[in-house]
Amino acid sequence: MGIIHEENMPVPEPEDGRITFGSGYPSKAIEKFIGYYDRNSRIAYTPSMSILTDFSIARAYCMYNRSGKSDIVYLDSRFDPERSESAKIALDKFRSICGVKGYFTFYIERERRYVRAKGLSESSAVAAAVSSALVSNIFGYNVKAHSMLASRFAKFVSGSGTRSVFPGLSTWISYPGIQEPKCLAHEIKIGLSKVKIAMFPKFADYSTNQMHELSVKSAQYIPWVLNKFARFEEIIDRSFSLEDLLIRAEEEMLNLNSLLMSVGRVLQTEESLSLIERIISFRKKNPGLYFTADTGPSILVMTLNENLLKEFLETETDFYISGNIVKDSSPSASNAFRERGKAFFESLQRSQ
């Protein structure tokens, strides 16, 4: 189907003081990802697949400083030392691969349609935003391979971020033995307008990184991996049937939860389990409604029947967000964000 395309690495063109913009939306996995084969190179054991959603958005400015002393991350208008340290790890990888010296300052804002939740893939949106801004800064906005480079480097911030660079449906090609430059996502160009979605944000306090580490210790992990490769081939053979994708998203959620329960980790809460029970009860008389979740209790409801989704949501008292699958993954900066970003970099220059 021509999913995989390759582009050569362009020549870096760093410019001291240059400021560039990037943005990203959160991906919601159809074919889930958990566990790294090579954590240093961010190579997962399996390919994965997701849709891009509009439940939040991340916007980022990146400034290159040829003679700076350190990388700096400002997140939601405050200096974030923890994220600055984790950014250094990703940026060291970028500098090593591209042969670029110097440091970077990021000004990042997240805009959410909810207050607090776990499993809404905010990290993937941030990864796509900062990687897009970084690639634009060093290689230029119009470089032919921009999206593929942004996808490649986003994985060093968040594995799922490699897919958040692309609109609609995308797949992250990853498996043991793949070369790091080829371990990135590719857009799958199919019509998704019939897919209707809504999100029920739910909160839980646990670390996704811990889930990655624990998952590979499960006796179920190898069977889970083998099942994924087999089902991935089936989905491709059936030309990415929309019904198949929704069915697989639900199946994968249940498989992932089972996998992590086998190492003593329960992802769902009383609230999310109650919601799942109501979904299952509703569709006994109204088939065609599906649900899924990633490494968190937030539940995505999906269907190819818009009226069916409306009917279910009318019965619900839990907070939910009606959403859309994003068709354009590169929105421009809002005027308000431009003004705040400008003020930030001006104050930064005055303090130096």
Task: Spell out what each predicted region is.
Residues 27-31, 59, 88, 128-135, ...:
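Predominant activation on well-ordered alpha-helical scaffold segments within soluble catalytic domains
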Residues 82-90, 126, 146, 271, ...:
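Short amphipathic alpha-helical segments
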Residues 1-118, 135-143, 328-352:
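ATP-binding N-lobe of GHMP and related small-molecule kinases
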Residues 28-32, 50-51, 58-63, 161-173, ...:
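Short beta-strand scaffold segments in enzyme catalytic cores
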